[in-house]
């Protein structure tokens, strides 16, 4: 049977060798092996070429019909399979928390909440964080890890061990040929920075989610949940994540729920992108050196390791916006401009990861940063296996949250804040798109139009000088030279315009790309909160109608309260880093603009002084 795939999203070809896709279109695959996140196939119009692997779902068997409600005995792992189906799932893990149905204990301790998790049972809509592609990150053995990457090692080889040719510290952005037009796409559609990122198939939902949908698929942000790790959240100064089954918490502050700060903050540099080879030079890849400040021990990672980490984090965290990685590309992977652009994107990504109070302390992230993979591959594999077999995922994420017992939130106020943030993200997304378009167009004009126009002016001045040189009078020589120098000055100013976007506009567009990824994550996070509020309203109505006990309705409201704390904490963190990042970037932009115009002024002043001696 010929390999086929179904397009999950529309894709418009932009480069030679690519083909366009339409959503739901069925394609024929030339090979199931992806090439750096791209597949080759033939679309329904007979065009053959490359397209992103993340945009399609491989069809391996006839699509199943709607699953019948199998009752309590049915495998829970099929509760959240989307209409198009997933790849075959691993066996469902055993129930991790038998006491989930126990009632809430006294306010002094945290008990696992019972069934009836407050979430509506709407149909599942695969999202960017859930369906980053039909090619999903491996959850299986280390052999799967190796086979998926076509690599004899699960870690990046240290520089010098394989191949050579370290790249210098590339601070420049993309060249004039591709810098202005080839920026990150800015759209809240799921084609943002997709690359070949795959989020693994979700594990079996816990009791928190099983009661809600009565066999219907649930929104991915509830069922496709992720463990938090050692981080914490607080209501003002009062909500934290817990390692065990309860921790002391402090009272709420003036800003509402906030993530508790990381007690051991750190940063991580990404340097020395190095081209390496394997299989006697048949395969090449780029390795990056990471140096966390809290260990000062360098580790080397490939992009596929970042890709794997992203998939684990996207699986762990339901109400945390995991920043998107810079996108992949199949061609030009070893060009200096692309390596520089990707490195800058990874630096922004790492900055947001290290500054997030929860993500920064996550075990899998710390393993990624600190495991000396080149000298202890066994430890790397053990940490990888531990992350992939972690049972604290799905709705079990909320079991790791501890909120102040007396800090119940006003659900109407919560709903108002969520609605306000939803409007904010929509407006910010539109504004980011507009600014990105304007910056792209302005950069293009500087690189091509402004440079050309200034050089035309310079050429005209030199033509005038050459005409004046026909006069052989001695007193005319100084003027001729001054006018020629003026022409050269305008040529130099044109070059300054062509080089300037790398210094000011490109960094702004890089920041917009990162935040556009965040904005693409929030609809799912908001959807979880909205569903929880809807479930609370339904439970209250059922109590009034005598269809539900008051105790059960109170439990639903308590669990909605937990979701509200987490959601508002993430929203608050987003605003904090937004203010920090855009303040810093706007300062940098204006400083670079000032430096640029000072250079232009200096060129003009030098030309002006040439006339003093005429």
Swiss-Prot record:
A Pfam family that the UniProt record links to this protein: PX
Positions contributing to a 1,2-diacyl-sn-glycero-3-phospho-(1D-myo-inositol-4,5-bisphosphate) binding: 302, 304, 342
**Disulfide bridge partners, by residue number:** none
The protein's UniProt keywords, in alphabetical order, are: Cell cycle, Cell division, Cell membrane, Cytoplasmic vesicle, Endocytosis, Endosome, Lipid-binding, Membrane, Mitosis, Protein transport, SH3 domain, Transport
Database matches in SMART domains:
PX, SH3
Is-annotated flag, keyword Magnesium? Answer: no
Which InterPro entries does UniProt cross-reference here? AH/BAR_dom_sf (IPR027267), PX_dom (IPR001683), PX_dom_sf (IPR036871), SH3-like_dom_sf (IPR036028), SH3_domain (IPR001452), SNX18_PX (IPR035703), SNX18_SH3 (IPR035557), Snx9_fam (IPR014536)
Regions of biased composition (Pro residues) lie at: 90-101
Gene Ontology molecular functions:
phosphatidylinositol binding
Q: Which residues form the SH3 domain?
A: 1-61
Q: Which CDD domains match?
A: BAR_SNX18 (cd07670), PX_SNX18 (cd07286), SH3_SNX18 (cd11897)
| Recorded domain comment | The PX domain mediates interaction with membranes enriched in phosphatidylinositol 4,5-bisphosphate.
Annotated protein name in UniProt: Sorting nexin-18
Task: Give the species.
Answer: Mus musculus
Lineage at the top is: Eukaryota, Metazoa, Chordata, Craniata, Vertebrata
Name the gene behind this protein: Snx18
């Amino acid at each position: 049977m010929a390999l086929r795939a179904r397009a999950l999203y529309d894709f418009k070809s932009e480069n030679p060798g690519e083909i366009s896709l339409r959503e739901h279109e069925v394609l024929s695959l030339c090979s199931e092996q992806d090439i750096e996140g791209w597949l080759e196939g033939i679309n329904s119009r007979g065009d053959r070429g490359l397209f992103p692997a993340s945009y399609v779902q491989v069809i391996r068997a006839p699509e199943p019909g709607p699953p019948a409600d199998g009752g309590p005995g049915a495998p829970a792992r099929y509760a959240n399979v989307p209409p198009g189906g997933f790849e075959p799932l691993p066996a469902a893990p055993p129930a991790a928390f038998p006491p989930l149905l126990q009632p809430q204990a006294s306010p002094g301790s945290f008990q696992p909440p019972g069934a009836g998790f407050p979430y509506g049972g709407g149909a599942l809509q695969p999202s960017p964080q859930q369906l980053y592609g039909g090619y999903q990150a491996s959850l299986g053995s280390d052999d799967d890890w190796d086979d998926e990457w076509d690599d004899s090692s699960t870690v990046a080889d240290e520089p010098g061990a394989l191949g050579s040719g370290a790249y210098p510290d590339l601070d420049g952005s993309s060249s004039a040929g591709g810098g202005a037009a080839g920026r990150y796409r800015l759209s809240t559609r799921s084609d943002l920075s997709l690359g070949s990122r795959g989020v693994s198939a979700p594990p079996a939902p816990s009791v928190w989610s099983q009661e809600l949908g009565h066999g219907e698929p649930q929104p991915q942000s509830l069922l496709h949940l992720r463990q938090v790790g050692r981080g914490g959240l607080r209501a003002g100064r009062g909500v934290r994540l817990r390692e065990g089954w309860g921790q002391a918490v402090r009272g709420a502050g003036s800003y509402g729920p906030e993530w508790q700060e990381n007690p051991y903050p750190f940063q991580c540099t990404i340097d020395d992108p190095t081209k390496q080879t394997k299989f006697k030079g048949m395969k090449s890849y780029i390795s990056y050196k990471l140096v966390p400040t809290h260990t000062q021990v360098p580790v080397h990672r490939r992009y596929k390791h970042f890709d794997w980490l992203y998939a684990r984090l996207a699986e762990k965290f339901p109400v945390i916006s995991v920043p998107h990685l810079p996108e992949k590309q199949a061609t030009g992977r070893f060009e200096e401009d692309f390596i520089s652009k990707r490195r800058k994107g990874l630096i922004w990504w790492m900055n947001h990861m290290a500054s997030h109070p929860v993500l920064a302390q996550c075990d899998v992230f710390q393993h990624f940063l600190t495991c000396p993979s080149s000298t202890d591959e066994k430890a790397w594999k053990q940490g990888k296996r531990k992350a992939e077999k972690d049972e604290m995922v799905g709705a079990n994420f909320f079991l790791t949250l501890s909120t102040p017992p007396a800090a119940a939130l006003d659900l109407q106020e919560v709903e108002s804040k969520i609605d306000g943030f939803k409007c904010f993200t929509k407006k910010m997304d539109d504004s980011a798109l507009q600014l990105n378009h304007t910056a792209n167009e302005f950069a293009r004009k500087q690189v091509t139009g402004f440079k050309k126009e200034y050089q035309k002016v310079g050429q005209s001045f030199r033509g005038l000088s050459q005409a004046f040189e026909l006069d052989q009078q001695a007193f005319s020589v100084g003027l001729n030279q001054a006018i020629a120098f003026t022409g050269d000055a305008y040529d130099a100013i044109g070059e300054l315009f062509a080089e300037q976007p790398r210094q000011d506009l490109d960094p702004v567009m890089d920041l917009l790309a990162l935040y556009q990824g965040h904005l693409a994550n929030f609809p799912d996070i908001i959807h979880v909160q909205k569903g929880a509020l809807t479930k609370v309203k339904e439970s209250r109505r059922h109590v009034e109608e005598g269809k539900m006990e008051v105790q059960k309705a109170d439990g639903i409201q308590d669990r909605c309260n937990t979701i509200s704390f987490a959601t508002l904490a993430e929203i608050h963190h987003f605003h904090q880093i937004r203010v920090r990042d855009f303040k810093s970037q706007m300062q940098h932009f204006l400083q670079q603009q000032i430096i640029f115009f000072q250079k232009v002024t200096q060129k003009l002043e030098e030309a002006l002084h040439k006339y003093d001696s005429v």
